[in-house]
Structures are given as C-alpha cells and as structure tokens.
Amino acid sequence: MTQKAVVMARGLGTRMQREAEGVELSEEHLRAARAGQKALMPLLGRPMLDYVVDSLLQAGLRHVCLVIAPEADAMRQAARRISAVAGARIECAVQQEPRGTADAVLAAEDFAAGDTFVVCNGDNLYPSAALGQLARLQDGDCRVVGFDRDGLLRHSNIAPERIKAFAAMTVAEDGRLTGIVEKPPDVERYVRDGHLWVNMNLYRFAPAIFDACRSIKPDPVRHELELTAAVAELVRRGKPAFRVVFSEDGVLDLTSRSDIPAAERALADRRLSF
C-alpha cells in the first residue's frame, strides 16, 4: 500500500492573478488571488489546501509533502497547522525555481526515499475513488488516472474549451499507457472507442520517475521541464510498467478567479475531518 503523497503547490498562479470580468469576490478571495496563492485560496472559510490534504488522508495517504517556493512561509505554517490538528505527517520540500512539474517532483526525491508515492496538484480536488485506488496498490508499477472527457465535463467546473489545455493519453487494450501529449493542438485525434482520456496530474509513481525527470529537456515552446515528458520517457523505457486507472468522475479545478464561485458551490456540503 502507498502511504506517501506529493502535492505540487509551487506554481506562480499567473492565471489566478488576472482580473476576471463579471466575477464578484470577497476581499479575502482577492488577496489570495493577487498573490497567486491557489492552495491557500479560502473556500467557505477553509483554504483549498485543507480540502486537498483531507482527501489524501481519507484515502490512506498519511504522509504528505508539499512542494513549495523558498519564500512560501504561509505554506509552511499551513503544513504545521494541519499536522497538529489532523494527526498526520505534513512536510515541505522546496523547488527553488518554477522550472516545471518534473522539477517539482524532483524536489520531493528525499521525501519519497525509495518508496512509491502519489502525485497531485495543489489546485485540484480529486475523486476519492481514484485516490483510494492508487493508495491501495501493492505492486511497484506506475499509474496515471485517465479522466474521461465527458465525465469531466459532466461532473467538474471545467469548460469544454479548457480540455485542450491538459494532456491527452493513448491507452492499449490491456490498460497500458502508450502515449501522453501535453496540450495537443488537435485533441480529437486521441479519441478511442468514444473516449478521450485526459491527464489531470494524478499519478502513482515508482522511484524510477526521478531518473526520467532528470533525463528530459525543457519543452521548446513552454520552456519548462514537464512531468508528461518524464512519463513519456518511462513509457518508452518500458520498465516499470505504466498503466492507466480509468475514471469517469469529475475534478474540481481552481485555476482562475472565475473558478472560485463554482468551487464554493461544489464544496457546500463537504465536511472536513480536521
């Protein structure tokens, strides 16, 4: 069973900092938005991070590492607070520069310490079924959760035009991941048997991911070390095996200011364990 989780929370939050026409926010929301602090965005009186960590804890992932910026003292304080009240181990790893998601995972190598671990975003809230399935795995293989496009559109606050901003996947009949492409220009070419499997950065990794992260080069357009490139490298190598966990559930997304009202509506009945 996997008990460790890495939460990528180093992003600059540039889209959250942009004004959103027609969206009325509280002063508390605006302060967090101006700072680009998506993980600390207050939602119904609790920061987004509390919901993210609570989901991990409920899935059995009791040892959590937050990947943060060097100057993110508020995140360090949040980690200490949650550790104290939730009875879990919450620690931080520093990503010195915002060089991309692969670099964020590398920042947590000491935390992983040779164990398998789950990786997720700090500005997404994932379905408990998918998290639990990853946590219960007993093997040493890698997994990525493939979210069905139609399920995302039905059960998330994600608009259809935003699907192209994520990575698309190709999957073999036996469930092996065969390809993953970040922000493809034509997502329809990845539809198979009526499904487009979308990557929302929810993984279960073996330690081999770290060597793959070190082996890649920055994307020539976005100039970042992208985790999808490291995943593609592991798929190319063939070991460890990389399989897809399929989900037709939704993912709560907190990318921009316009997502905040929808996020609060979605969380209206949510009760945290700490």
Model-derived features with residue positions:
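Short, surface-exposed amphipathic charged segments that create phosphate/polyanion-binding patches used
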Residues: 105-111, 157-163, 258-262
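Conserved beta-strand segments of alpha/beta enzyme cores
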Residues: 39, 89-91, 176-179, 241-243
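The conserved acidic donor/metal-binding loop of glycosyltransferases
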Residues: 122-125
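Conserved N-terminal catalytic core of the sugar/cofactor nucleotidyltransferase
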Residues: 1-35, 41-119, 221
